[in-house]
Amino acid sequence: MEKKKKLILFDFDSTLVNNETIDEIAREAGVEEEVKKITKEAMEGKLNFEQSLRKRVSLLKDLPIEKVEKAIKRITPTEGAEETIKELKNRGYVVAVVSGGFDIAVNKIKEKLGLDYAFANRLIVKDGKLTGDVEGEVLKENAKGEILEKIAKIEGINLEDTVAVGDGANDISMFKKAGLKIAFCAKPILKEKADICIEKRDLREILKYIK
């Protein structure tokens, strides 16, 4: 019998990878503390995601692209990520990542882990430097939920056969749409909306709960 096709959508920063991409880039720009403070408020749901992202990216203005690339080299997949994705694919899952962060980091991990889809925002670069602007389809509050629906539609998968894995407030919209909602080392605001909360920082833990 053919396996039923299902979909799993991962958040990127602090879920599929150990880092917060923007915090790593901010370290290169010497504005790490300011940016971290805004990231924390956004993940706790105290700030609108798009406003907070634009505010953080504006602090990166004039950073050379080489410094961005240096920061991205520090981004590492979460413990167990490679095994987990391999096993999910064996179980018939389409595996996707969606990030309010940046394609320059997300696409590297997509290739490394062999993901089927990756959605992220873009840092605008001019003359080899960041302009302090950002564009993309993961800026709005409900963007992740819309992307989950979009992939499910393309792949012909029912929403009840979808899983969302995330850690912060901007993952709420995909939790609202997904059949199974897994909070991974998450903030309290997301745990409230989850079916399952995992506290151990090892992605293999999710396999216990996924058919």
UniProtKB/Swiss-Prot annotation:
InterPro entries: HAD-like_SerB, HAD-like_sf, HAD_sf, PSP. Optimum temperature is 70 degrees Celsius. The keyword Magnesium applies. Keywords: Amino-acid biosynthesis, Hydrolase, Magnesium, Metal-binding, Serine biosynthesis. Pathway: Amino-acid biosynthesis; L-serine biosynthesis; L-serine from 3-phospho-D-glycerate: step 3/3. It comes from Methanocaldococcus jannaschii (strain ATCC 43067 / DSM 2661 / JAL-1 / JCM 10045 / NBRC 100440) (Methanococcus jannaschii). GO terms for molecular function: L-phosphoserine phosphatase activity; magnesium ion binding. Binds 1 Mg(2+) ion per subunit. One of its GO terms (biological process) is L-serine biosynthetic process. Its EC number is 3.1.3.3. Optimum pH is 7.5. The active site is at D11, D13. Substrate binds at E20, R56, S99, G100, K144, N170. This is Phosphoserine phosphatase. It comes from the Archaea. It is an enzyme of class 3 (hydrolase). Belongs to the HAD-like hydrolase superfamily. SerB family. Mg(2+) binds at D11, D13, D167. GO terms for cellular component: cytoplasm. Its cofactor is Mg(2+). It catalyses: O-phospho-L-serine + H2O = L-serine + phosphate; O-phospho-D-serine + H2O = D-serine + phosphate.
